[in-house]
Design a protein with these regions (language model features):
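Conserved phosphate- and dinucleotide-binding cores of soluble alpha/beta proteins
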Residues: 1-111
Length: 111
């Protein structure tokens, strides 16, 4: 009854971009839709809402809404570039534990 998850940032050197899972045009369109990164391979905004984008309609992954049904959800992630998507994941209200580095933790707590 636990899920250990992470998030991905939305930038040219992200894992999704480096693996060619998204291209520059898709990255730009995701930004335009308000995406800050991905949670469970679904693109979310700063409030943790899944953005309206074609990539979210064709992904095969645990729907982020299902995270609410898991008793213990642990998010392990850190780094300056991931702060917006970590914040989005936390804003969803389904994360129970955050494992991160000191710098990221301080930025999240102090804005």
């Amino acid at each position: 009854d636990i899920a250990l998850i992470s998030v991905g940032a939305l930038h040219a050197n992200s894992t999704m971009a480096l693996l060619a899972l998204i291209d520059k045009d898709e990255e730009a369109a995701l930004r335009e839709a308000g995406a800050v990164g991905d949670l469970c391979a679904q693109w979310i905004d700063i409030e943790g809402r899944v953005v309206d984008h074609e990539l979210n309609r064709r992904v095969i992954a645990l729907p982020v809404t299902d995270l609410n049904t898991i008793p213990n959800v642990v998010l392990a992630s850190g780094g300056e570039e991931k702060i917006p998507v970590i914040l989005g994941a936390l804003n969803r209200g389904s994360i129970d534990v955050l494992v991160t580095d000191e710098g990221t933790g301080n930025r999240l707590l102090n804005g």
